[in-house]
């Protein structure tokens, strides 16, 4: 949890608004560890129930991803910590730049470091 907490604190130090969003997984113990780490750090968070499975799956659409260098500038990033431990950033959904909507940028994993560029590229899916 050090990376997203540090990212949120760093963003705030530059005057940016931050919000940590959390979706529960089927790994209950790990979920509780994440929540405990956020509480211990004094970081507020929002619990979201929108997932890519179950009742919410029909709400998600397939979007074409873009490489970072293809994207227009965005000054309103949302950082997402997935239940897998992967951390992504993307522009807010209501931004006027269509290419940037729901185009995740893989920041890393809180569980393990990728050993090579090929593994990182597979996770980024760019």
Curated annotation (Swiss-Prot):
One of its GO terms (molecular function) is isomerase activity. Pathway: Antibiotic biosynthesis; fortimicin biosynthesis. GO terms for biological process: antibiotic biosynthetic process. Its EC number is 5.-.-.-. Transmembrane segments: none annotated. Keywords: Antibiotic biosynthesis, Isomerase. It is an enzyme of class 5 (isomerase). It comes from the Bacteria. Catalyzes the conversion of fortimicin KH to fortimicin KR. This is Fortimicin KH epimerase. The lineage of its organism: Bacteria, Bacillati, Actinomycetota, Actinomycetes, Micromonosporales.
């Amino acid at each position: 949890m050090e990376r997203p907490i540090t990212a949120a604190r760093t963003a705030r130090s530059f005057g940016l608004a931050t919000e940590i969003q959390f979706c529960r997984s089927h790994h209950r113990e790990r979920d509780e560890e994440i929540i405990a780490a956020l509480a211990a750090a004094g970081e507020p968070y929002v619990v979201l129930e929108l997932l890519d499975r179950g009742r919410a799956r029909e709400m998600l659409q397939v979007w074409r991803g873009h490489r970072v260098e293809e994207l227009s500038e965005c000054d309103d990033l949302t950082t997402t910590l997935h239940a897998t431990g992967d951390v992504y950033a993307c522009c807010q959904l209501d931004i006027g730049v269509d290419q940037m909507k729901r185009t995740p940028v893989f920041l890393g994993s809180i569980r393990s470091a990728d050993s090579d560029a090929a593994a990182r590229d597979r996770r980024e899916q760019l």
